[in-house]
Curated annotation (Swiss-Prot):
This is Tubby-like F-box protein 10. The gene is TULP10. Gene3D superfamilies: Tubby Protein, Chain A. Residues 1-11 have a biased composition (Basic and acidic residues). Residues 22-78 form the F-box domain. Belongs to the TUB family. It comes from Oryza sativa subsp. japonica (Rice).
Length: 352
């Protein structure tokens, strides 16, 4: 009798959950939007209070649609709310301040959203990466789950792959940067299909997953002196800022905004300190060859493109033995910025 009774109990629980969700989903759309709007207004601009908005979006489809309508995308609001924010470009007028924690023994790197100023800030966990050695190459697998860094996982968001010398890198996204983008022919990309299971943690489950090349990073030979600053160049396929993430999900299409070319900002030599210096505005406190600032430069393949030598798009620097700050802004996303910063770890032969 017990074997017959258990399925009935499970069925009863499932029916109860469906009935409960039906009651929440049956509320007027205007009422649901007003509730979500008040939750955001009641101190939900920063984490951890902002998790209440995520809870609202998890109730059912109607509440999720209301949250998408009320909560503005990262480029407009300047706030990271949902996992989709990690693939959206940062705000234009100010940087998103994050920090990276390194665990050398486990070859792990953790990205956090900075909530407070100071190295004692616990932060809001965003992504994690782990370094793997695969033959002559080194790979950094990036995931939304620090405990699951498999490329076959729904938490997988992309990876960074280096050459043998550790001077040239390619960034792979698990989702296409634009329509008709071609996936790489690596073995790991063949494990992904177009299907997804309910409850997927992927940033955009509606779009087929794979490994799409969205950026390249190269470290050039150091012509100044030993232990001098690294010379760094990045070519990135950046996400569109002209349409909201919600619209891209509805149309299942993504736009290509062209290529962004970045290079490291040239430091100045400080005679008194006898070292190369950059102005990090107090965000970097420990001298390190890993410290850098990236600015936009003109694209050689487009004669009409214009660079901006003053606005720092991404800066990365050391504040403790295993803690680094990471500040990024438009046109980079958090995922792209994190991947670029990961490339600074490890020895660069003939570059330093």
């Amino acid at each position: 009798m017990a074997a017959v009774r258990e399925p009935r109990e499970e069925a009863a629980v499932g029916e109860g959950e469906g009935e409960e969700e039906g009651r929440w989903g049956g509320l007027l759309p205007e009422l649901v939007e007003e509730v979500v709007r008040r939750v955001e207004a009641s101190g939900g601009e920063r984490w951890p209070a902002r998790k209440d908005l995520v809870s609202c979006a998890c109730v059912c489809r109607r509440w999720r649609e209301a949250a998408a309508a009320v909560v503005r995308p990262l480029p407009e609001s300047g706030r990271i709310t949902f996992p989709s924010s990690l693939k959206q470009p940062g705000p234009k007028d100010f940087p998103i301040q994050c920090f990276v924690k390194r665990n050398k023994k486990k070859s792990m790197f953790y990205l956090y959203l900075g909530l407070l100023n100071g190295t004692m800030d616990k932060g809001k966990f965003l992504m994690a990466a782990r370094r793997f050695r695969r033959g002559p190459h080194t790979e950094y697998v990036i995931s939304l789950d620090a405990d699951d860094l498999s490329q076959g996982s729904n938490a997988y968001v992309g990876k960074l792959r280096s050459d043998f010398w550790g001077t040239n890198f390619k960034i792979y996204d698990n989702q296409p940067p634009y329509d008709d983008a071609k996936t790489s022919s690596t073995r790991s990309s063949q494990r992904f299909g177009s299907t997804h299971r309910f409850g997927s943690r992927r940033i955009c489950p509606q779009i087929s997953a794979g490994n799409f090349n969205v950026g390249q990073i190269s470290y050039k030979y150091n012509l100044l002196k030993s232990r001098g600053p690294r010379r760094m160049f990045c070519t990135m396929e950046c996400p569109s800022t002209q349409e909201t993430w919600e619209n891209s999900l509805k149309t299942k299409s993504l736009r290509c905004t062209g290529t962004t070319v970045l290079r490291n900002k040239a430091p100045r030599w400080h005679e008194h300190l006898q070292c190369w210096c950059l102005n990090f505005h107090g965000r970097v406190t420990v001298a390190s060859v890993k410290n850098f600032q990236l600015v936009a430069t003109a694209d050689p393949s487009h004669p009409d493109s214009v660079g901006d030598e003053e606005t720092v798009i991404l800066q990365f620097g050391k504040v403790d033995s295993n803690i680094f700050t990471m500040d990024y802004r438009q046109p980079l996303s958090a995922f792209q910025a994190f991947a670029i910063c990961l490339s600074s770890f490890g020895t660069k032969l003939a570059c330093e």
